[in-house]
Curated annotation (Swiss-Prot):
Protein name: Protein transport protein Sec23B
Molecular function GO labels: GTPase activator activity; zinc ion binding
A GO BP entry: COPII-coated vesicle cargo loading
Intracellular or extracellular location(s): Cytoplasmic vesicle, COPII-coated vesicle membrane; Endoplasmic reticulum membrane; Cytoplasm, Cytosol
Modified sites of kind N-acetylalanine: A2
Ranges for the Gelsolin-like repeats: 634-720
Source organism per UniProt: Bos taurus (Bovine)
Residues annotated as binding Zn(2+): C61, C66, C85, C88
Membrane topology, as annotated: Peripheral membrane protein
Subunit details: COPII is composed of at least five proteins: the Sec23/24 complex, the Sec13/31 complex and Sar1. Interacts with SAR1A.
Source species, domain of life: Eukaryota
PANTHER family associated with the record: PROTEIN TRANSPORT PROTEIN SEC23, PROTEIN TRANSPORT PROTEIN SEC23B
Function: Component of the coat protein complex II (COPII) which promotes the formation of transport vesicles from the endoplasmic reticulum (ER). The coat has two main functions, the physical deformation of the endoplasmic reticulum membrane into vesicles and the selection of cargo molecules for their transport to the Golgi complex.
Length: 767
């Protein structure tokens, strides 16, 4: 019998699913007492090189309110050619194509190893991929030049039949015609006036005029060229023209007086991009890619005025309700994001500037549409250039690692209901028998739209057990969930990926040990963290921390072993032992602590946390620390100030940053140049080892992390010192028998103090 850890890992590799609980409490009452909700992390398009898609359509349950897809959990009568749906128990006839099936000749979707299967839909014409570049021209010359080169490079990575468009903006917004041979022609819009989709389409001539009725000569072509073709052209037709056009882009000619910001019409430019695609390619996979080098300063969506002496809003301003433009700007971008999502398009934001660019107000554009958010200091850095290049990376079949216009549908057996989802999605408001009245995240529906996703995009799906306490589930009963993802593949095919999973029900009174052993503390920590971050968007920070603390105390009271009022007796089993320290680091993370971060930075961190898979999410919550020394090979060490020793090099991965830190002695040796002396070859290798490992992480991660090389006493050592558990501070540095390590100058409590308080509260009868 495989251990639960192996079972959890196998299921994640096969189905891209991690549940908080892998044995489910069999009644509503008991499930609410478990504290951590029954939920899962789902990676709908997890890469499976061993899973070739099947070239036929799925078989659906005939009950109109169910329509679940045939799967290995269904009961099959091979002689009568009938199958019983495992969700609603409807008996269904197999279609004629299945006439030859038998116990020894099963279709793939009935084999247990195909609990996840992908179908290629043959119906309907394939749709081309569409990329609409929206480019800020209020950049410094070297920044604009670097951006132009990156955009020209990206053209060579696109498939030849992809459609491409270009909008540029500064004080005015220009929509460039790409069909003119050798003539640059563009439509110019004022950057201060918002336009409706209808007005944009009328002005660009996208509404088809009535065709004049006249006899056609046989030689005349019967089809008029598409009205959209002036603005969106296949790359193979306009590759040279567009490369030249990008090369000729000039900085916005409008003069910027001293002490002023450039007039930047980001809100109108995005509005025109959304309106253009809305009128030409609704419900077709498309990416709007916004490149901006500063905050919107005029028109709808402006987040700050053009006076440089008035700084852009900070968290302090927001708390004091002193952010003048925030609410109106946020409303503008939310309206655009919802329109974009309704059309199945996604919006990426690439914001590179030293100051804030308005990501707080614009975050809903990528968050609701599944687009990317990239934040950097300049377009002329390897961080931006390599991150942008990785968007166009290919999979093992040579296809882009991106999918478009997806809908995710969740079906459950009758003892369960869907409470909601947290991730880069919007609700499709599909009510049904499996939709819970209690919402967690984006709820009130069993279907969500994810307009842009890749093989790592991960959603948190939350459930509610609705089975009543007095209606026991028979011994050995299993609950089932089916995830159905319809999407446009980057090869332009329509595909459906179906994942069907089941877990055992257990009676809490008699089988609590089984339920405990099947707790996945890593998945539970990430799922609870997602709930906390989701709440932090609308609630006060301290309230969210109090809520997380309360849940942790309740969980320890439920599953800890202890004697009342005796903290020393408190113990947690192995399947729960790491959970409190995940919560400790989560409380200190930039997702919940806004101190020392700008509103844009907080939005950026939260954006990535809401879409990454379990492994990356855990790194974000609790960074990984590796130690390099002469005492042995590199090894992971505790994220603790006691790990910072003079004769060590540390490598810390926080997901957003890779920090290499040289201990005091190592830094002195390096300054003395020992690594250049032949007799100290081993020291040279020691210095090189973390650089090689860091390079490996930098090559694989999206977005590319910020790379920081520092040493004891260096100003950037703060990145490491702010993350480690402050077990040694200026308060207890000289305690008797204290281990050597770096003292942290902080008033934050250490993990030890946090755990002592937790034990005290968990065992007290007052709680």
């Amino acid at each position: 019998m495989a251990t639960y850890l192996e079972f959890i890992q196998q299921n994640e590799e096969r189905d891209g699913v991690r549940f908080s609980w892998n044995v489910w409490p069999s009644s509503r009452l008991e499930a609410t007492r478990m504290v951590v909700p029954l939920a899962c992390l789902l990676t709908p398009l997890k890469e499976r090189p061993d899973l070739p898609p099947v070239q036929y359509e799925p078989v659906l349950c005939s009950r109109p309110t169910c329509k679940a897809i045939l799967n290995p959990l269904c009961q099959v009568d091979y002689r009568a050619k009938l199958w019983a749906c495992n969700f609603c128990f409807q008996r269904n006839q197999f279609p004629p194509a299945y006439a030859g099936i038998s116990e020894v000749n099963q279709p793939a979707e009935l084999m247990p190893q195909f609990s996840t299967i992908e179908y290629v839909i043959q119906r309907g014409a394939p749709s081309p991929l569409i990329f609409l570049y929206v480019v800020d021209t209020c950049l410094e010359d070297d920044d604009l030049q670097a951006l132009k080169e990156s955009l020209q490079m990206s053209l060579s990575l696109l498939p030849p039949d992809a459609l491409v468009g270009l909008i540029t903006f500064g004080r005015m917004v220009q929509v460039h015609e790409l069909s003119c041979e050798g003539i640059s022609k563009s439509y110019v819009f004022r950057g201060t006036k918002d336009l409706t989709a209808k007005q944009i389409q009328d002005m660009l001539g996208l509404t088809k005029p009535a065709m004049p009725v006249q006899p056609m000569r046989p030689a005349q072509p019967q089809e008029r060229p598409s009205v959209s073709s002036r603005f969106l052209q296949p790359i193979h037709k306009i590759d040279m023209n567009l490369t030249d056009l990008l090369g000729e882009l000039q900085r916005d000619p409008w003069p910027v007086p001293q002490g002023k910001r450039p007039l930047r019409s980001t809100g109108v430019a995005l509005s025109i991009a959304v309106g253009l695609l809305e009128g030409t390619f609704p419900n077709t996979g498309a990416r709007i890619m916004l490149f901006t080098g500063g905050p919107p300063t005029q028109g709808p969506g402006m987040v700050v005025g053009d006076e440089l002496k008035v700084p852009i809003r900070s968290w302090h301003d927001i708390e004091k309700d002193n952010a003048r433009f925030m609410k109106k700007a946020t409303k503008h971008y939310e309206m655009l994001a919802n329109r974009t999502a309704a059309n199945g398009h996604c919006i990426d934001i690439y914001a590179c500037a030293l100051d804030q660019t308005g990501l707080l107000e614009m975050k809903c554009c990528p968050n609701l549409t599944g687009g990317y958010m990239v934040m950097g200091d300049s377009f002329n850095t390897s961080l931006f250039k390599q991150t942008f290049q990785r968007i166009f990376s290919k999979d093992f079949n040579g296809n882009f690692r991106m999918a478009f216009g997806a809908t995710l549908e969740v079906k459950t057996s009758r003892e369960l209901k869907v409470a909601g989802a947290i991730g880069p999605c919007v609700s499709l408001n599909v009510k049904g028998p499996c939709v819970s009245e209690n919402e967690l995240g984006v709820g009130g529906t069993s279907q969500w739209k994810i307009c842009g996703l890749d093989p790592t995009t991960t959603l948190g799906i939350y459930f509610e057990v609705v089975n009543q306490h007095n209606a026991p589930i028979p011994q050995g009963g299993r609950g089932a969930i089916q995830f159905v993802t319809h999407y446009q593949h980057s090869s332009t095919q329509r595909r459906i990926r179906v994942t069907t999973v089941a877990r055992n029900w257990a009676d809490v009174q008699s089988q609590l040990k089984h339920i405990e052993a099947a707790f996945d503390q890593e998945a539970a920590a990430v799922l609870m963290a997602r709930l906390g971050v989701f709440r932090a968007e609308t609630e006060e920070g301290p309230d969210v921390l109090r809520w997380l603390d309360r849940q942790l105390i309740r969980l320890c009271q439920k599953f800890g072993q202890y004697n009342k009022e005796d903290p020393m007796s408190f113990r947690l089993s192995d399947s729960f032992s790491l959970y409190p320290q995940f919560m400790f680091h989560l409380r200190r993370s930039p997702f919940l602590q806004v101190f020392n971060n700008s509103p844009d930075e907080s939005s950026y961190y939260r954006h990535h946390f809401a879409r990454q898979d379990l492994t990356q999410s855990l790194i974000m919550i609790q960074p990984i620390l590796y130690s390099y020394s002469f005492h042995g090979p590199p090894e992971p060490v505790l994220l603790d100030s006691s790990s910072i020793l003079a004769d060590r090099i540390l490598l810390m991965d926080t997901f957003f940053q890779i920090v290499i830190y040289l201990g005091e002695t190592i830094a002195q040796w390096r300054k003395a140049g020992y690594q250049d002396m032949p007799e100290y070859e081993n020291f040279k290798h020691l210095l090189q080892a973390p650089l090689d490992d860091a390079q490996e992480i930098l090559q694989a991660r999206f977005p590319m992390p910020r790379y920081i090389h520092t040493e004891h006493g260096g100003s950037q050592a703060r990145f490491l010192l702010s993350k480690v558990n402050p077990s040694q501070t200026h308060n207890n540095l000289y305690a008797w028998g204290q281990e050597t390590g770096a003292p942290i100058l902080t008033d934050d409590v250490s993990l030890q103090v946090f755990m002592d308080h937790l034990k005290k509260l968990a065992v007290s009868s007052a709680c």
